[in-house]
């Protein structure tokens, strides 16, 4: 289980998170929804200890992440797969080596036979052919880079998957491919997932519950139906804004 308790964070005079309470149950997929720049990625980085809260606590499986020692934090991170927004692939390494980096057990990482089989399996899980392993990141499309990033995140057989804007920069077709993949991995691997996104439609599709982060606070938490039925002005404002943006995008297309 992941739990944030009254977490606050500011950068200089800008309050990013203000007394945020948030939890994800085992086996659940929760979408953290909100406009760009609202602090969703900051919240996600608290979970893996890349950012420490100014106040409050972050718990993963009952462990207080801000209070873990370096070795304890490394052990916790070995159970968490993180999908970076831009893919964060190393351009000097081929796809095989990029995915291999996700194998968190050092013995398995060094075992080339195990690594080769694991990379092949991860490529299969993200619907990429084995020969993609030989390609360099520069040869991949945007959608393929995203899928390789996901393959690396699952290479260590994590308990948790954290997705930071997995469909950002993709067209609607490739966004649907990634959303379908997130759903399937949840079913096949049984992982607990947090999906950071600004896409209302995608969040409604992949998540068991949605948490709306707006103006530094969690404004609503619930199923897609509950979010749509909310009378909270902040929730309605965000949904109307997303609808307007979708209409404008449709006109451009």
Language model segments and positions:
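Conserved ABC ATPase "signature" region
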Residues: 63-64, 112-131
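Helix-to-loop junction immediately C-terminal to a conserved catalytic motif
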Residues: 48
